[in-house]
């Protein structure tokens, strides 16, 4: 049998009158005897303080304060302590023989409130030889000791091996240890439990029937049915949570679209503005850089323009200075050209008239001769024509009768004969007998030459004849011409002078003929001289442009160098053009590629976002479309496996739920019908009787009763035999056992207990062997243990089922997401990153732009060098051909020499011009001067002979020509032979006729032509004479005008003058053109400089403004980025696909979202205000604040009982997965959690029956208690009538009130309260809520009325009240009640504490002198029977015979107060025995 724990001693350290006193406590009764003020109450106060160290409860009052409403301010504790550290310690030993010292350290706190500081502690493992006073005191000398502080006590105990010291910060922990170690009977979990315990101790201490206990006796005696209540609370909490969750799901379902809409629109609103600002910031940075580049370029351009302006202004000044002289020279050259042209025109007229006169003179002379010859020829022709006419007429008459025609042979014969005759005539005339037709052509050339020679000789003689004929008239004319040229001379000298003049005229004419070559030579030399001067000017200008003086010898080498430079630069320029074209082509290709990639980038980004979401959801990285499709197949397989596993877990969970429901039946009945049968038979279920069996005993009893563990125990089997007839609504096997349910035991069977098994001898010939079940369910503890394990398993299964359901739905949604991804993005998701390619291409584009700029600069420099080189080469090309001119130093001398020669030639030309006509007239008639008249006859003969020779030669040539012409006729010999005989006469006639007709025709024609010619010649002669006279007059006028002009007019003068004028005009035009160009260039340069200056000012202003804007925007942007990163929304706002939209598109997107958001947040004042503030375009961070506010608002709206995330976007995604599953699961859970009203009534009724039985058992222990006239004490328990009606309605008439219990708007407690109000409308419920009333109705203790009754004298049983009993009777009755309460607490706490511990039982009784000896003996007997310790305080006249008695005497010695204590053992029946150590007086010493 388990020994009960005992209090061994009480130790007081530094209390008022007790410095270090240990009271050994008796196992039964310890009596404190002493007079008033001896310290009895102080000792008990120290015990109570160590037992309940709660200053809110402790209140030590004396009997004079019993009716007072308030006691002393220190609650009676402050005044009982001495200054310094005080201790109160209880030394106990529990059922396990463990020594435990518990206590408190007390210390007065200075102040008018007289507070006390309490620190509880516990010491375990202390050896039995160590006394408590040795722990907390330190001996200084024989008469002095010091109290240790709590820290010093801890250090001291730490040095002791095996000793554990615990200090507690809460009273709950302190009492929890005392309960676990068996020091107190009840676990004091709360302040309410401590208050009950203190009220019990207080009632025990001061004695009597405590109204605080009797009024709430149900709370003390009836244990709280925590299991049932907890089950109801859990059920209602679960139902409430279930309904709240379902409501939350419904709210969430309604909010889901709002969430989506709000998040979507807020994201579009803020992200569009965020990305627009990001784009604008990038654009502004690019613009600022572009402004800066353009600013530097413009500054360079302005500097170049300024240098260019200075050069052009200097050059313009030079050209302005040269223009005046050029204009004067040009005007002089123009005037000279006009004079030369006028002179030339006059000279041309003169020459033309002179030529015309000469021609007219010749024509006139020739015409005179022609007219004379024509007249003679006319006479001859007339005579010849008449003779020919006569001959033709005669021949025609002879041939009138002859045949008129011949055939072809005759014609050929004629032609042959003519050819033969012509050949013969040629031989005869030419004296060539060997002449043949073949050699006729050669001879023809010879005779034609002879004819020509004879003709020339004839003409010469003819001329001489003519001269001779006119010699007389011409001699005088020739003489006059010689005299006009030479002056007067003798006639005999005329021939010699004429010849000399003709020779001199030839020389002069030769010199005159050299005028033009000399003039040309002079013009050429002058041109060369001008070219030399121009070359010198060009050389000077070239040296000036080159900035260096060059020698003539260096120009060729420089030309070659420049040519080579031009060639290289030309190649560079041409290659540069190709390179530039290639670069521009590549740039265009890059731009086109970038545009294509920018169009493709949003699609790719959307695909990547979808792919990243899939990767985040599945935790996999995909690198190809094949991996996606393979993972999709794996996903399908995983989904099938998860569905199978979920269904298996769901089946197991349902089985566990069914088993829990079966085990949760009241009374342990697995079948509801057993409860109805037990009520019908008036019995009790066996499992209900053994409901309190311990967990250790459950296997034994389960095996003992075997199948009959669900039997019904009835008082009498014979009374229910009739009820068994026709019984159908019952289990297949119904066990009935006869016995008293109030005193039933297991003696009905003969049992042999084996190892983990029993053998039950049911009858002599029937045994049953039953092993202990591994999982017993017999008894409430076993069922609760099994239910607890099943609940744990169910929680695991539920969690696993929820996880699997979540995984299944997640997998299904993931499968849908994969399907959408494959359908929409698979084709582009695994292509190369277009943004990386865009960055690479942009880098390449920047390189190309930089290369193009560098190339353009280099090309510009090369072009400039090329132009300079070309200009130099052009100048050298003009100079090089003139190098010899530049080197010719004698050119000017040669010009002077030629000028002198030209002057001589011009003098000769003037002579020829003056006497040329006379010389020309003299020359043909000069021979007249040498001829004399006597030579005329000889000339005549020579002329005749020459004429005959010429005629013969002409005939010979004619005959040979006829032979040559008739060479083809010599082949017609055959035709001649045929016609030779008969056609001779005819041929002759014809020949003569033909000759005559020909002659006649010639004569006529000649006559006509000569007649016409004669008339024409006469007319021409008249017109020539008239023209000659007119032009002679005009010639004289023109010569006078030419002399008036005074300009030498030669053939090259006009050309030289024009060339000079044109050169000067070209120079002037070039100068003016260059000046105009320079003026225009200067104007353009000044305008360009002004434009550049304005542009520079504008660029500087724009650059500074843009830079300030960039800097300002950077600060704002940094604040925005900091806010974005601090709130973790960058991933939501930085949507890269929006970077490819324009600012207008983003602004439109933001405005549309803003309009939608205004409607969405119209009902939310906070979001509406934040949205209104965010509309400020100058404060972009406010949009971020709005976005964060939206997220915070949505986080607050997220139901954390459904969605375990702070991210609203993830919450929406999880909602989609969770809502349908939770709705289905919670609906089924609500159906399972709901409990029927009948079950509630049965549970409450069974609990009431069980507690009534327990109270009856407790009453058995009170039957022998008697005090004075009180013979017995009992507890009376009854069910309240209103509550009994409620139970009946719940059991039998619940169908009438299903409107309450089936309502989803009411919890079960509220429905129960509504039913109670419906059944008892007369009861006023006050301000309590239905939930509170319902919870009270679920507590079975509220159904019971409990009161204490005493059997007193002749009054019989009456209610125990202090007014009806004497003081002693009331003290005894109250003490009896307290003992029963303690025993009830122990029974209640037995299941919570280890079974090997029986707690300590101790009560107090102050002022025990009011009890008589018989009553005190009754208390002693009660303590002995209940193994209870009792501490009583009594005056000195109390001397109990049993237990231990301490005599306390308070003494004062030298202003020092102390209590003298003497302890005595009980003296009956033994002699009194003095306890060791009790004779020594306590001598307090000063604390050192």
Curated annotation (Swiss-Prot):
Tell me a GO cellular component.
nucleoid
Q: Which spans of this chain does the record mark as coiled coil? A: 326-418, 444-472, 509-602, 835-923, 977-1116, 1209-1265
State the disulfide connectivity: none
User: Which InterPro entries does the protein's record reference?
Assistant: MukB, MukB/SMC, MukB_hinge, MukB_hinge_sf, MukB_N_dom, P-loop_NTPase
Which Gene3D superfamilies does the annotation name?
A: 1.10.287.1490, 1.20.58.850, 3.40.1140.10, Immunoglobulin FC, subunit C, MukB, hinge domain
- UniProt-listed Pfam families: MukB, MukB_hinge, SbcC_Walker_B
Region Disordered, annotated ranges:
1049-1074
Q: Where is the composition biased (Basic and acidic residues)?
A: 1051-1065
Q: Where in the cell is it found?
A: Cytoplasm, Nucleoid
Protein keywords: ATP-binding, Cell cycle, Cell division, Chromosome partition, Coiled coil, Cytoplasm, DNA condensation, DNA-binding, Nucleotide-binding
* MF (Gene Ontology): ATP binding; DNA binding
Where is the stretch described as Flexible hinge? 666-783
Question: Which sites bind ATP?
Answer: 34-41
Q: Which family does it belong to?
A: Belongs to the SMC family. MukB subfamily.
Tell me which PANTHER family the record gives.
Answer: CHROMOSOME PARTITION PROTEIN MUKB, DUF4476 DOMAIN-CONTAINING PROTEIN
The record's subunit annotation is: Homodimerization via its hinge domain. Binds to DNA via its C-terminal region. Interacts, and probably forms a ternary complex, with MukE and MukF via its C-terminal region. The complex formation is stimulated by calcium or magnesium. Interacts with tubulin-related protein FtsZ.
Functionally, this protein is described as follows: Plays a central role in chromosome condensation, segregation and cell cycle progression. Functions as a homodimer, which is essential for chromosome partition. Involved in negative DNA supercoiling in vivo, and by this means organize and compact chromosomes. May achieve or facilitate chromosome segregation by condensation DNA from both sides of a centrally located replisome during cell division.
Domain remark in the UniProt entry: The hinge domain, which separates the large intramolecular coiled coil regions, allows the homodimerization, forming a V-shaped homodimer.
User: This chain belongs to which protein, by name?
Assistant: Chromosome partition protein MukB
Q: Which organism is it from?
A: Salmonella gallinarum (strain 287/91 / NCTC 13346)
């Amino acid at each position: 049998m388990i020994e009960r724990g005992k209090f061994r001693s009480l130790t007081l350290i530094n209390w008022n009158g007790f410095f270090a006193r240990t009271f050994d406590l008796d196992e039964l009764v310890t009596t404190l005897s002493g007079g008033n003020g001896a310290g009895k109450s102080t000792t008990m106060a120290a015990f109570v303080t160590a037992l309940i160290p709660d200053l809110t409860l402790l209140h030590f009052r004396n009997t004079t304060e019993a009716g007072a409403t308030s006691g002393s301010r220190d609650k009676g504790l402050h005044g009982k302590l001495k200054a310094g550290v005080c201790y109160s310690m209880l030394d106990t030993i529990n059922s396990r023989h463990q020594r435990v010292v518990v206590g408190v350290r007390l210390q007065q706190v200075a102040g008018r409130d007289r507070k006390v500081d309490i620190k509880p502690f516990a010491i375990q493992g202390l050896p039995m030889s160590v006394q408590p006073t040795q722990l907390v005191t330190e001996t200084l000398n024989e008469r002095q000791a010091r109290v240790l502080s709590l820290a010093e006590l801890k250090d001291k105990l730490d040095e002791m091996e095996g000793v554990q010291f615990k200090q507690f910060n809460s009273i709950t922990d302190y009492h929890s240890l005392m309960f676990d170690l068996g020091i107190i009977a009840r676990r004091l979990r709360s302040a309410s439990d401590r208050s009950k315990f203190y009220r019990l101790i207080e009632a025990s201490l001061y004695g009597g029937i405590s109204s605080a206990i009797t009024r709430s006796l149900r709370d003390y005696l009836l244990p709280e049915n925590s299991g049932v209540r907890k089950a109801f609370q859990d059920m209602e909490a679960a139902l409430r949570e279930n309904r709240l969750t379902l409501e939350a799901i419904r709210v969430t379902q309604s909010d889901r679209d709002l969430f989506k809409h709000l998040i979507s629109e807020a994201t579009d609103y803020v992200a569009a503005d965020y990305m627009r600002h990001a784009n604008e910031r990038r654009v502004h940075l690019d613009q600022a850089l572009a402004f800066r580049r353009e600013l530097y370029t413009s500054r360079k351009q302005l500097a170049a323009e300024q240098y260019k302006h200075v050069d052009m202004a200097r050059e313009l000044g030079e050209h302005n200075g040269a223009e005046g002289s050029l204009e004067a020279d040009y005007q002089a050259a123009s005037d000279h050209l006009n004079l030369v042209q006028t002179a030339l025109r006059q000279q041309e007229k003169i020459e033309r008239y002179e030529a015309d006169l000469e021609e007219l003179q010749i024509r006139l002379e020739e015409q005179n001769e022609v007219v004379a010859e024509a007249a003679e020829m006319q006479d001859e022709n007339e005579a010849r024509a008449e003779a020919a006419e006569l001959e033709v007429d005669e021949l025609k008459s002879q041939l009138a009768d002859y045949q008129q025609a011949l055939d072809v042979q005759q014609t050929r014969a004629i032609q042959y004969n003519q050819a033969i005759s012509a050949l013969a005539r040629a031989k005869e005339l030419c004296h060539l007998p060997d002449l043949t037709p073949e050699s006729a052509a050669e001879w023809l050339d010879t005779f034609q030459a002879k004819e020509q020679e004879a003709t020339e000789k004839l003409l010469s003689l003819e001329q001489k004849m003519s001269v001779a004929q006119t010699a007389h008239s011409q001699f005088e004319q020739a003489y006059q011409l010689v005299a006009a040229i030479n002056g007067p001379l003798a006639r005999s000298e005329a021939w010699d002078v004429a010849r000399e003049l003709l020779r001199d005229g030839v020389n002069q004419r030769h010199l005159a003929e050299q005028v033009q070559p000399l003039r040309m030579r002079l013009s050429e030399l002058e041109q060369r001289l001008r070219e030399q001067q121009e070359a010198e000017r060009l050389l000077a200008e070239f040296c000036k442009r080159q900035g260096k003086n060059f020698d003539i010898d260096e120009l060729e080498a420089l030309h070659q160098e420049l040519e080579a430079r031009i060639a290289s630069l030309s190649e560079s320029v041409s290659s540069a053009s190709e390179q530039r074209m290639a670069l521009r082509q590549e740039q265009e290709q890059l731009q086109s590629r970038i545009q294509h990639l920018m169009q493709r980038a949003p699609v790719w980004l959307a695909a990547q976002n979808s792919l990243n979401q899939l990767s985040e959801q599945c935790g996999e990285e995909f690198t190809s479309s094949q991996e996606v499709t393979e993972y999709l197949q794996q996903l399908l397989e995983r989904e099938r496996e998860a569905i199978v596993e979920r269904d298996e877990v769901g089946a197991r969970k349902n089985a566990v739920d069914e088993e829990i429901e079966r085990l949760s039946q009241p009374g342990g009945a697995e079948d509801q019908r057993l409860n109805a049968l037990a009520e019908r038979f008036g019995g009790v279920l066996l499992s209900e009787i053994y409901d309190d069996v311990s967990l250790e005993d459950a296997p034994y009893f389960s095996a003992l009763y075997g199948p009959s563990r669900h039997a019904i125990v009835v008082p009498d089997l014979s009374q229910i035999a009739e009820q068994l007839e026709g019984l159908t609504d019952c289990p297949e096997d119904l066990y009935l056992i006869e016995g008293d349910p109030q005193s039933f035991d297991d003696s009905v069977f003969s049992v042999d207990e084996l190892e983990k098994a029993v053998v039950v001898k049911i009858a002599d010939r029937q045994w049953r062997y039953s092993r202990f079940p591994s999982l017993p369910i017999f008894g409430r503890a076993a069922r609760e243990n099994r239910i607890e394990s099943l609940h744990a398993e169910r929680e695991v299964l539920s969690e696993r089922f929820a996880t699997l359901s979540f995984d299944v739905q997640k997998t299904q949604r993931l499968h849908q997401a994969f399907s959408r991804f494959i359908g929409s993005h698979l084709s582009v998701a695994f292509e190369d990153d277009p943004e990386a390619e865009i960055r690479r291409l942009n880098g390449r584009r920047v390189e190309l732009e930089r290369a193009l700029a560098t190339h353009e600069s280099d090309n510009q420099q090369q072009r400039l060098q090329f132009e300079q080189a070309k200009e130099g080469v052009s100048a050298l090309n003009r100079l090089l051909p003139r190098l010899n001119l530049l080197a010719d130093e004698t050119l000017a001398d040669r010009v002077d020499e030629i000028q002198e020669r030209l002057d001589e030639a011009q003098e000769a030309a003037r002579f020829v011009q003056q006497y040329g006509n006379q010389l020309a007239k003299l020359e043909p008639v000069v021979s007249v001067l040498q001829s004399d008249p006597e030579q005329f006859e000889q000339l005549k003969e020579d002329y005749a002979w020459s004429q005959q020779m010429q005629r013969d030669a002409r005939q010979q040539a004619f005959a040979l020509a006829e032979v040559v012409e008739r060479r083809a006729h010599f082949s017609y010999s055959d035709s001649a032979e045929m016609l030779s005989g008969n056609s001779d006469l005819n041929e002759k006639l014809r020949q003569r006729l033909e000759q005559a007709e020909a002659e006649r025709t010639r004569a006529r024609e000649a006559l006509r032509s000569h007649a016409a010619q004669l008339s024409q010649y006469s007319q021409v002669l008249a017109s020539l004479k008239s023209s000659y006279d007119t032009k002679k007059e005009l010639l004289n006028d023109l010569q006078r005008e030419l002399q008036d002009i005074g300009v030498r007019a030669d053939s090259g003068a006009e050309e030289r003058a024009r060339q000079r004028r044109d050169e000067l005009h070209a120079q002037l035009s070039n100068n003016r053109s260059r000046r105009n160009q320079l003026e225009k260039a200067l104007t353009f340069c000044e305008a360009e400089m002004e434009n550049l200056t304005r542009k520079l000012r504008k660029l500087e202003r724009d650059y500074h403004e843009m830079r300030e804007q960039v800097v300002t925007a950077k600060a704002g942007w940094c604040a925005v980025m900091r806010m974005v990163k601090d709130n973790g929304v960058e991933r939501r706002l930085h949507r890269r696909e929006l970077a490819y939209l324009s600012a207008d598109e983003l602004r439109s997107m933001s405005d549309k979202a803003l309009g939608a958001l205004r409607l969405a947040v119209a009902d939310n004042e906070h979001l509406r205000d934040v949205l209104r503030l965010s509309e400020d375009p100058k404060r972009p961070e406010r949009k971020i604040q709005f976005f964060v506010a939206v997220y915070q608002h949505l986080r607050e709206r997220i139901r954390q009982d459904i969605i375990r995330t702070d991210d609203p976007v993830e919450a929406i995604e999880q909602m989609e997965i969770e809502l349908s599953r939770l709705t289905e699961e919670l609906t089924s859970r609500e159906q399972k959690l709901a409990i029927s009203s009948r079950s509630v009534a049965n549970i409450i009724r069974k609990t009431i029956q069980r507690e009534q039985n327990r109270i009856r058992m407790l009453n058995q222990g009170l039957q022998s208690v008697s005090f004075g006239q009180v013979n017995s004490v009992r507890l009376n328990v009854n069910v309240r009538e209103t509550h009994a009606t409620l139970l009946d309605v719940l059991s039998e008439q619940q169908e009438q009130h299903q409107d309450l219990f089936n309502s989803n708007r009411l919890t079960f407690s509220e429905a129960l309260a509504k039913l109670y109000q419906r059944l008892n409308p007369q009861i006023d419920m006050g301000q309590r809520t239905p939930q509170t009333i319902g919870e009270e109705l679920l507590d079975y203790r509220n159904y019971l009325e409990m009161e204490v009754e005493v059997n007193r004298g002749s009054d019989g049983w009456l209610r125990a009240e202090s007014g009806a009993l004497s003081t002693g009777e009331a003290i005894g009755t109250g003490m009896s009640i307290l003992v029963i309460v303690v025993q009830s607490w122990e029974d209640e706490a037995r299941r919570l504490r280890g079974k090997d511990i029986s707690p300590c039982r101790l009560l107090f009784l102050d002022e025990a002198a009011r009890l008589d000896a018989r009553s005190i003996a009754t208390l002693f007997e009660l303590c002995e029977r209940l193994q209870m310790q009792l501490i009583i305080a009594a005056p000195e006249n109390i001397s109990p015979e049993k237990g231990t008695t301490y005599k306390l005497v308070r003494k004062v010695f030298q202003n020092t107060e102390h209590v003298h204590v003497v302890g005595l053992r009980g003296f009956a029946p033994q002699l009194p025995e003095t306890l060791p150590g009790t004779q020594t007086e306590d001598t307090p010493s000063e604390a050192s």
